[in-house]
């Protein structure tokens, strides 16, 4: 089963189109990370949070990414990083049209 990584942290913006323009180079580098299948970017201007949900090919790749990304976020001044690693239940996810390969 592929692991799913959820990361979120306090974020004061920008949001929407402005964050798209600001973070596009980062997105283009993230897709090159070893073992990453996909990432869904998350943001909430109302609660001042951002993050993402990531699907990896294996737990080692997910753990390596979490460690690297936590260092990157911390170096950028981000505090309050929350992360959870889950196993994906493929059969049930497929029934519910989960984007599982």
Which residue ranges define each predicted feature?
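A common structural junction motif
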Residues: 70-78
């Amino acid at each position: 089963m592929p692991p799913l990584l959820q990361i979120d942290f306090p974020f004061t913006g920008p949001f929407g189109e402005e964050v798209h323009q600001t973070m596009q180079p980062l997105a283009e580098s993230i897709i090159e990370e070893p073992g990453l299948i996909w990432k869904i970017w998350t943001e909430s201007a109302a609660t001042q949070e951002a993050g993402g949900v990531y699907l990896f090919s294996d737990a080692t790749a997910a753990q390596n990414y979490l460690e690297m990304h936590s260092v990157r976020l911390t170096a950028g001044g981000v505090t309050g990083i929350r992360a959870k690693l889950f196993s994906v239940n493929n059969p049930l996810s497929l029934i519910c049209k989960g984007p599982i390969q």
